[in-house]
Each structure stands twice: as structure tokens, then as C-alpha cells.
Amino acid sequence: MGSHRVFRSFWWATNALLALSLLGTLSTGIWEHSVRQYLKGFSDAIIPEDSSPQQKAEAILAWISYGPPRREASDTSGLSAHDPTDTLNYRQLLDVCGSATNAFLNLSRSSGLEARRLLLLSPDRTAKHVVAEVHLDGRWVIVDATYRAMMKDTQGKPLTRADLQDPRLFQEATARIPGYIPVYSYERVAHVRVGALPVLGPVLRRVLDAVLPGWDESLEWSLLLERRSFAYFFLSVWALIFFLLLRIVLAWLADHRLRIPRLRLRASLTRATATFFSTPEIK
């Protein structure tokens, strides 16, 4: 009997968490949808409809550089670098490499461009700068939103991170950017810095590299890092899946091993629906 009480407590806790994760999925899904609609309206307003992919990227950079006056926050602690309504509207965030890159990436995605973040790493593998990669004509070219520039050579050809590992091309590209800090070089780069996690980081990266080669090239990882609404929606969906599977396992144990009567959700919903829609009998 004691084990049955423990099981029942676990069963009801699982049902409660399943309900909460369902509510979380619905609310964060609505949040993410509203953010996407906001970004779509924003990008439609600043990017001409018939623009080529490169023109779209350059139009976004031009808006970041020469757009309308931005708000000034007296206290930036209340701003989020992962909320587009903040990164697109506050000058302080558009002056920081991480949040400026997030603003560029969010507008790029909403305009139909494939874009992802790229971390430039120091020798000890800490991030020293953040830029974006945009997929143009089959190549991932570098856009530095902090300096409002697409990296190009002297002929105007956009450059990839592999190109910028060549000292000559790096010098050509950065010479045309006023105030560029040369230490922001491309010898060591990463899309997601899992290795920075304490203890588990290096192990997790090795496991992911073995199980999912090229996993960090995925655009979804970049979206998780740059948009808070999508990150919460992603976590809510996985919580919903986890608790739903856990409920199925517990239901099987209750029916086939412990022989414990339990609330059958489908049967209860069927009875409730039948009662609601049935015509009352008048005597």
C-alpha cells in the first residue's frame, strides 16, 4: 500500500507538470508568433521587396547605421540582448557586438535570409567578438553588425570566414572599416561554445560531435541563443514531450504491473463531451 501511495503521488505530480508544460507551450508559442509578426513588419518596412539577398543584408546594416533616433535607457540592466523589441530600439544594445548581431540576425531571418551567429575566439577559447554569417550565392559570408559592415575584398567580393583567415584578405577587408580592432581575427571560431560549460562542456561537445556531426552549423542553435521567446518555446515543447512520455510509461505500469485504478483522460473527456452535447431528457 505504501508503494501505491508513492506511485499515486508521482502520478498526480506528473499530470500536474504535464498540464503546466502544455500551458507553457501554448503561451510561449503565442509569444514567439507575436515576435515573428513584429519582426516581419519591421523588416518589411526597411527592406525593399524586390531586393536581392545581398541587398537585403546591406539594407539591414544601413538601417542599423542610419535609422531613426534610438531610445536611450537610463538603466540597461532591464534590457534584454535576446528580446528583439529591445535590441532593435535601444542605442546601447545596438552598440554591443552580441546584441547588435542578434538584431541583425532577427531581421535577416524575418526577411528570408539564412543567417547565423559566429563567435571569434581568443587562444583560451573565450569569445572576443560576435559576428554574423549570411548565406549568399552558396557561401557563408561575414557581416559584422557592430561595425555595420559586410566583409569584402578590394574588388567588392564578400568574404567568408575561411577567406578572412588569410592575413592579406583580412587586411583588405578591415582597412576599409574605420576603427576596426585587429585583434578581432578569424583564426579560431565557433557557432556554439558548449565547451565553456563547467565540467560537462568538453564532454558534451565530444558526444555531440560523435552523434551529430556538424550539429553546431544548424541555424536553430543560433536562433536559440539570439531570441528568448524561441528558447522558452523550445524548452516548453521538450518538457511537454518528456512529461507526456512519462505519463504513458506510468499509465502502462499502473495498468499492467501495479493494477492500480487511475484517471483515464481520454475516457473522462469522452464522457464529458457526450454529457455536454447530449440533449437532456425531460420527464
Region spans (language model):
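Juxtamembrane/start-of-transmembrane alpha-helix segments at the extracytoplasmic/lumenal side
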Residues: 7-14, 218-241
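Secondary-structure boundary elements
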Residues: 27-92
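Short N-terminal edge-element motif at the start of the domain
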Residues: 81-117
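Extracytoplasmic/lumenal ectodomains and periplasmic regions of secretory and membrane proteins
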Residues: 147-219
